[in-house]
Every structure is written in C-alpha cells, then in structure tokens.
C-alpha cells in the first residue's frame, strides 16, 4: 500500500512534467542527460524509477499470501520466502521513500503555467459551482445539470467563454442575476482554505 501511494505521487509528477502540461519538473542538473538519444529531453527519471520500484515491491504480495497456508499451522516452507522478500522489500521501500522525499524537496513548481493551463479551459472548472447554485434558486438538479452541461459542451466544442455562454442564457439569468453569477467565477473561492489544508497535512 505504501509503495502504491508512492507510485501515485510519482505518476502525478510524471504527468505534470509532460511538455504540454509542465506545471512541475524534477530538478535537472547541469551535466545531467534526460535522454541518451535526444539531448533536448528532460525526462522525470527519478519518478519513473519510483514507479518501477513500486511494481517490484508489490510483487512480494503474492509470495507473502502463499505463505499463509502452512502444514498443521507450522512448517518451514515459508522460511526461504520470508528471508528473501523481507529484507529485499523493506530495503526497496526505504530507498523509495527517501528518493520520493528528495524529489519533492527539489521539485520545480511553475505557478504561471498552472494559471495558463486553467485559462485554456475557458472557465469550465467553475461549472460545479454554477450547477450547485442553480439548485438553490428553484431548479431541480436535473434541470441545473442539463443547463450547465449545454453551455459547457458549447465551450468545449467552440473554445468560447463558459461565463459568456451562461450569462447569455435568459432562463438562467431570470433566476440568477449577473452580479450573483459573476461571484461564482471567482477563482479565490477555490483557494481560500489552502493555508488551513497545508497546516493540517504538513504538521511536523
């Protein structure tokens, strides 16, 4: 389970380092090579390594389960297995934890790229707030979902502003005035508890 949790972090970092995303990036030394064949690449090699280690560690689960059934509650058929997977697995896990810690400590973060990627959605990440607000002004959830989805799909397909699509809908504006609707597109709403979250989860 710990190894799989490590892999979750590693997989997320690998995705976020892709050229078209590039919101975070592993530290890259001056003399480091990202690819032996392509000099321009900066592959997340440490996170890739952690993914492989997680697979290796999980491979110990099957022999561990095979050790459950012993003759008359006790024989030594399990001994060779435990002598192998015990030290190998714990050593690999310790190494993976230390490596993940170093990756996170030295991770390059690109907030401006995060903002740029959010803007590419044309405001679609506000759709849930609009949906929930509509259910408080007289629409059923089904009606709210249908209204929001229609404008969200239009934004996806045409690249138009989700807010502009919503604000032009007379059915929505009749019950949700523009001044209230505009507040639903305030990005700070999603980050207002960020300090509390960090303090709660990063206690020493």
Question: For each predicted feature, which ranges?
Answer:
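Glycine-rich cofactor/substrate-binding loops
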Residues: 38-204
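Acidic, glycine-rich loop-and-beta core segments that form the ion-binding/anion-interacting portion
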Residues: 1-61
């Amino acid at each position: 389970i710990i190894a799989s949790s490590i892999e979750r972090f590693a997989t997320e970092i690998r995705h976020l380092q892709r050229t078209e995303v590039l919101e975070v990036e592993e530290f890259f030394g001056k003399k480091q090579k990202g690819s032996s064949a392509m000099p321009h690449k900066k592959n997340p090699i440490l996170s890739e390594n952690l993914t492989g280690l997680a697979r290796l560690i999980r491979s110990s689960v099957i022999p561990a389960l095979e050790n459950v059934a012993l003759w008359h509650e006790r024989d030594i058929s399990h001994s060779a297995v435990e002598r192998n997977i015990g030290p190998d697995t714990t050593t690999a896990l310790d190494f993976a934890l230390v490596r993940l810690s170093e990756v996170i400590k030295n991770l390059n973060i690109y907030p401006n790229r995060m903002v740029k990627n959010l803007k590419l959605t044309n405001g679609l990440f506000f759709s849930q707030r609009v949906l929930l607000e509509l259910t408080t002004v007289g629409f059923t959830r089904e009606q709210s979902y249908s209204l929001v989805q229609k404008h969200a799909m239009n934004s996806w397909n045409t690249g138009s502003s989700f807010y502009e699509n919503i604000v032009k809908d007379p059915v929505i504006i009749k019950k949700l005035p523009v001044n209230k609707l505009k507040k639903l597109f305030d990005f700070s709403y999603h980050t207002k508890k960020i300090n509390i979250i960090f303090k709660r989860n990063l206690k020493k």
